């Protein structure tokens, strides 16, 4: 069974384009995880503190409803409204499924930050060009197995591997305009 999952993940990674631009269509997954934040309300404006106009620290996130059998969690923060295609702001893999939150500005022990669209293994706060508000998706994925990702994996490759292995997800959306 594990070899089959590895094959599915490999196929997803191979089929995905590299780089931080457009991503393919998302896999249809059950939305059983609830993601919230004390930093901003669902659908609300993300305070400047968490953006390139402020301290650019990651916001606090909390979640519930992680399915039984989850081995690890992965977090992806992206902007589907970016002019050049979806921009990936943050990828965090190997989150302990027993954990129920990320503190503001924190990455817990054992978790791994992967490259964002700027090529940095770090949180990159919202920083849209002037104009209408962009939507920032904070998506948490439940994974039944540990997904091994190369430290130098392109964001699209890492996300494809996570989405292919995931059994469920949850999403919080915030907005920001400059």
Model-inferred region functions:
Residues 2-6, 12-178:
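N-terminus-centered regions that define maturation/targeting leaders and the start
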């Amino acid at each position: 069974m594990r070899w089959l999952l590895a094959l599915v993940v490999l196929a997803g990674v191979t089929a995905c384009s590299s780089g931080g631009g457009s991503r393919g269509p998302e896999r249809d997954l059950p939305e059983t995880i609830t993601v919230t934040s004390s930093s901003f309300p669902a659908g609300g404006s993300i305070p400047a503190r968490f953006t390139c106009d402020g301290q650019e620290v990651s916001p606090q996130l909390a979640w519930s409803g992680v399915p039984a059998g989850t081995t690890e969690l992965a977090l992806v923060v992206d902007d589907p409204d970016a002019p050049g295609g979806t921009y990936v702001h943050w990828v965090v893999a190997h989150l302990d499924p027993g954990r129920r939150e990320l503190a503001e500005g924190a990455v817990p022990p054992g978790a791994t930050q992967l490259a964002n669209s700027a090529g940095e293994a770090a949180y990159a706060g919202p920083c849209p060009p002037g104009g209408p508000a962009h939507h920032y998706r904070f998506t948490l994925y439940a994974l039944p197995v540990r997904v091994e990702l190369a430290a130098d994996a392109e964001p699209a490759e890492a996300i494809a591997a996570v989405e292919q292995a995931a059994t469920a997800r949850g999403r919080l959306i915030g907005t920001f305009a400059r």
